[in-house]
Amino acid sequence: RNAITWYILFNLLGLGLGIYIAYAVKKPYFSLIFIYCIFSLWAYSKRMKTSFLLGNVQVSFLTALAIFNVALFDMIPNGINKTNNEFMIFKIILCYTAFAFIITFIREIIKDMEDMEGDQKINANTLAIKYGIEKTRKIIVFLILIPVFGIAYFQYNALISNFFVELNYSMENLITVLYISLIQFLLIILLVKMNKSNKKSDFYFSSSLCKVIMIVGILSIPLFTYLQLN
């Protein structure tokens, strides 16, 4: 009963703050986003959690939306000028949004593999139950390769433009490349681990590693901002 009370209070608080922000940016219809989030989380707990992929996609989308809201509320209402740094910042936010979605999606599927025994008891229709551990593991390996190659593409462009064309060997650029390499290294560890995971403990480790990757990725936002401003 106490949990339900707190659930309602926090939902009302979040909705109230969301409506306030929507009116502050003079886009009152943006408040529908927060209504959608509340309804989606309720629907997830009732039905989506046991449905095939729908719950995984929903949680991933809501996680990514939390990052995209920065652009949605701060940049889009004023218009994005393609002739200055605003458009570049918008593209960076889109990259972070995509990163949050794919890592959360991977983690949600791994959690389903970890909880497979319990999900079978409640007749859940998860990817792991429908296709088995072996096929699901191959799907996850493929999904991990998406951010790995995405980061590799960014590293290539950063190295070519900053170090070989502009000959800009600044500490800021070096730290940026090294930090991104750390994220890629963690993704490769996840890739190797998932390629041979079979036990519940393996899936627990991989799920926890996804959390670490997400945290390291999010921490890069204030770090890169500080490096650019100083």
What is each PLM-predicted segment?
Residues 1-35, 123-162:
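Multi-pass membrane catalytic core of lipid/isoprenoid biosynthesis enzymes
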Residues 1-8, 42-62, 121-138, 192-216:
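Interhelical loop and helix-boundary elements at the membrane-water interface
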Residues 16-31, 69-95, 153-171, 225-230:
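Helix-coil boundary and interhelical linker segments in multi-pass alpha-helical membrane proteins
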Residues 11-20, 37-38, 67, 144-152, ...:
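Hydrophobic core of alpha-helical transmembrane segments in multi-pass integral membrane proteins
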Residues 59-111, 116, 134-145:
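Functional transmembrane core segments of multi-pass inner-membrane proteins
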Residues 45, 135, 156-230:
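Extended hydrophobic alpha-helices typical of membrane-associated regions
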Residues 1-80:
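Intramembrane alpha-helical segments
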Residues 2-6, 10, 29-33, 54-59, ...:
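Alpha-helical transmembrane segments of integral membrane proteins
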